[in-house]
Amino acid sequence: MTRLIRSKKQFLIRSLHSVFYYLGSLLHSTFEMNVFIGLLLATVVASQSSEGRDESYTYKQLCIVDDKPQVLDGFDCRNQVAVARWQNAVNTTGWTFLEVETKENYCPQLQAYSAGYLEGLLSKTVLTYHLKNAQEDYCKNFTGYCSRLSDFLTENQKWIQSSLETVAPDDLYWGAVNRTYHQVSGLIDAYEGREFKPRITYELHPILYLNLNGDFYDLEKKLNKTRDPAFEQTGGKCSGLIKVAPGNADLFISQVTMSGFQNMLRVIKLYKFGYDRQFYPGYASSFSSYPGLLYSSDDFALQTSGLAVIETTISVFNTSLFENTKPVGQLPTWIRAIVSNQLARDAREWCKLYSLYNSGTYNNQWAVLDYKKFKPNQPLPKNGLFYVLEQMPGKIVYSDLTWFVEKYSYFPSYNIPFFKEITEISGFIGQAAKMGDWFKWGASPRAKIFERDHGNVHDLDSLTALMRYNDYKNDEFSKCKCNPPYSAEAGISARGDLNPANGTYEFPGQGHVNHGALDYKGTNVELMKKLQFVAQGGPTWGKVPSFKWSEFDFKDKVNHVGHPDEWKFNTLVHKWETEINA
């Protein structure tokens, strides 16, 4: 009987696949057809399976067989170029997991393309969901803006292609850019069902758009896209914290990313490349990310170089600065972040590398911590432990702030610039004059909460508690000139969905919005050695209710394919199968 039921299900799926393929063939492009078929078929398969509840990895590998590359199942072929591990446990943990490892005895471009190709194969279903949720409607009702965006990106891609084709073969920086483009090209080719053919594609593919998602924050302003107030994120985009434990016993770095709830399909990733470690000290990196993205984008990333990197986004209120953002001569943030993570040997070099080819898009405050410089229970070094970098269009400022951590034992990051020059040119002074302390460094709600509560952090559990903190109805620092007189956006982990839709607020991002904290990540000295970190998926819960799509009034307005209904997951530390010695 079980076999009969299973065969009927398989027959139904095959039959529906044929119908879906015919209907999908009526669409205009291969990409549209793939998304259409993938979503419909995945919906049927999901109803017959335990999708999102994987208890172990699925493996694929790229092997050389009879002098030809072949994709095989498993992880132990003889002439292995790359191996990838994938686990979709979003319904049990709030996360999916990916490990990709490439082997040093093959050329770097083949390694990079293979890494992307295997990721594209393994993550295709979840990537299809994420494209549906995060990308599908991006240009809906914004055809003029998207035409301008396409023109801008096309010109930028042409400049990058020209640079890659003319730069000296031994140029280390552009060599890393080349490998990054091979990796994303492999991912695109696998997703589209194309043959394995190591190359670079410069097409404006939706997967490229996913990697540019952070850069779009500012390109939308430069290219005049009008935002929906219900999706306004002026309230805050991330929270970050660097903290030294009492007696210098431990060193923590953590970050909470905030965004629209459609972006909650997440991947905890590890890339380990067989690159020359002399030139690529960050040959391996672990990070929180999203389907189809080659970098964190939160950002939270740990490197074998000993560098841990986070960022929180800074708004550009002085829009005249975008005259400095041009399609020629500049690289988007996602590429510069990857290159800096791979090539930098210390925090200062990371800042120097990241400062090259400033695009003035995805303008962030970056915090770079060098764990090599820290010795538990010993005095902090005088310099080199901790750098902060802030970017605006046309301007980057960075400095060694080891002294700050030594003096105050912490450094908080909450979407407001620290450096005076960036504060002045960004327009934050004028914004604070209009809107008050919400936009003042040291005076905003999260600044005050960090100042009051950082002293409670002494281990990973207390770090997690602070970074997931939101008690907006009772905390004095969450009060505002609003009705009701507080905002759930005024927490270390925001929950804009909890603000009443009929409330009155000082500005849209303070009120009822599709916006909140999507996760938590944090590490310490011991976990950093293995590129591991504590993670918690989904919006914060405990002092506030857990997030449920079925109870969210935006549920019919915001795509959330592949999501669990209730996001109520515990913390975890994912242990890598790949051997890591950071």
From Swiss-Prot:
Glycosylation sites: N91, N141, N178, N224, N318, N502
Signal sequence residues: 1-42
Family: Belongs to the phospholipase B-like family.
PANTHER family tied to this protein: PHOSPHOLIPASE B-LIKE 2-RELATED (PTHR12370:SF7), PHOSPHOLIPASE B-RELATED (PTHR12370)
GO MF entry, a single one: phospholipase activity
Annotated Gene Ontology cellular component terms: extracellular region
Biological processes annotated in GO: phospholipid catabolic process
Protein name: Putative phospholipase B-like 2
First-listed, main subcellular location of the protein, grouped into a coarse class: secreted
Swiss-Prot/TrEMBL keywords: Disulfide bond, Glycoprotein, Hydrolase, Lipid degradation, Lipid metabolism, Secreted, Signal
Domain of life: Eukaryota
Disulfide bridge partners, by residue number: C139-C146, C480-C482
Protein location: Secreted
Enzyme Commission number(s) from the entry: 3.1.1.-
Function (record text): Putative phospholipase.
Organism the protein comes from: Caenorhabditis elegans
Annotated Pfam families: Phospholip_B (PF04916)
InterPro entries, per the entry: PLipase_B-like (IPR007000)
